[in-house]
Design a protein with these regions (language model features):
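Glycosyltransferase-associated regions of secretory-pathway enzymes
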Residues: 1-105, 123-278
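Active-site acidic Asp-centered loop
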Residues: 116, 121-122
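Small-residue hinge/turn detector
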Residues: 107-116
Length: 278
C-alpha cells in the first residue's frame, strides 16, 4: 500500500544519500570563529509576508510577540541575498522548477544558520510563549521523534532549528545539500533532508555525541494543534494545548472557508485568523 511504498522509497533514498555523508565527513574542516553573536530569529516567506495567507501572518505575528528580545528577521525571495550567497546552480534549478520551494527553503535555512546561527522558525509555526533558554542557549536544538525506530526513519523535524553559528552538523548539512544538487537534478525523496540529517548524526561517534547533547523534546505535541484547528473553540482545551508546547506547527493549506466562502465559525481556526489566540 501507500505507506509501505513510502517507507521503501525512504530507505532507498537513505542508501543513496550515504555517499554524500561519507564524503562530507572526510573533507570537512572549519576554523571559523564560533563566538555566539546576537541571537537572530529567522523566518522566510517566498512571496513576501504581505502576500502570505492569514494563517502565516498570524504565525509570524506570534513570533514577533514572543521573540523575547531577540532580533527577528523576516526574509523573502529578494531579501535572502542580503544575508547569504546561493550557488548559481541551485538558483537555476529552483528557477527551472527542479528544486521546489520546500527544498529551496531547506537550503536557505541551513545556509543562514551555518553562517549566523540563531533560530529558524517556519512561517507556519505559531508561538504561544517565549523561546525557552534551553533553545536559545543550545549549541543545537531540534524537535525529535519519540519513536526512535520509526519505520519512516524521520528522527527530527526541521521546521524549528536553533543553533550556534558554524555548528558542525549544520555546516555539514549545507555541504551535503550543495553536493547533492550539484550532482542530481531530481528529488531523491521528499524527506531527503531529514534522512540526510539522521544519517549524518549517526555517521561518527563524535557526531552521535553532539546529537545526544540536544535536550529531547518530542515533535508530537508541537503538531497536535493542527489536528484540532477545525474543531469548536474551547478555552479549557486551548489552555491544555498551550501547556503541551510553546510552539505549534500548522499548515497554511488548512481549509479556511466553508462552501459559502465564509470563515468557518466558532473554530480554533477562526479564533486564530481573527488574532484572538496571540
Amino acid at each position: 500500500d501507500r505507506q509501505i511504498r513510502r517507507i521503501l522509497k525512504g530507505k532507498l533514498g537513505k542508501l543513496y544519500l550515504r555517499k554524500y555523508v561519507r564524503k562530507v565527513n572526510k573533507t570537512y574542516f572549519s576554523d571559523a570563529d564560533k563566538t555566539k553573536p546576537v541571537h537572530i530569529i529567522w523566518q522566510y516567506w517566498e512571496q513576501g509576508l504581505e502576500n502570505a495567507p492569514d494563517i502565516v501572518k498570524q504565525c509570524v505575528a506570534s513570533v514577533s510577540k514572543y521573540k523575547n528580545g531577540n532580533k527577528h528577521i523576516i526574509l523573502d525571495k529578494n531579501t535572502i541575498f542580503d544575508y547569504i550567497t546561493i550557488p548559481a546552480y541551485i538558483l537555476k534549478m529552483n528557477k527551472n522548477g527542479i528544486i521546489k520551494s520546500a527544498h529551496f527553503s531547506d537550503y536557505i535555512r541551513t545556509a543562514l544558520l551555518a553562517k549566523y546561527g540563531g533560530t529558524w522558525i517556519d512561517a507556519t509555526v505559531l508561538l504561544t510563549d517565549n523561546l525557552p533558554d534551553y533553545v536559545v542557549n543550545a549549541d543545537l536544538f531540534v524537535f525529535q521523534n519519540e519513536l526512535k525506530n520509526d519505520l519512516d526513519g524521520l528522527n527530527i523535524a526541521n521546521y524549528f532549528i536553533s543553533t550556534n553559528p558554524h555548528n558542525e552538523i549544520i555546516e555539514k548539512m549545507k555541504l551535503i545539500l550543495e553536493m547533492y544538487w550539484k550532482q542530481n537534478n531530481f528529488v531523491n525523496n521528499y524527506f531527503f533532508y531529514l534522512h540526510a540529517f539522521t544519517l549524518l548524526t549517526q555517521s561518527t561517534e563524535e557526531l552521535k555525541a553532539q546529537f545526544a547533547k540536544i535536550p529531547f523534546f518530542s515533535f508530537v505535541p508541537v503538531q497536535r494543534f493542527q489536528d484540532e484547528l477545525l474543531t469548536l473553540f474551547n478555552e479549557e482545551r486551548w489552555k491544555q494545548i498551550k501547556s503541551m508546547s510553546f510552539a505549534h506547527k500548522l499548515s497554511y493549506k488548512t481549509k479556511v472557508l466553508n462552501k459559502k466562502n465564509k470563515l468557518i465559525n466558532k473554530t480554533f481556526l477562526e479564533q486564530l485568523i481573527k488574532g484572538e489566540l496571540i
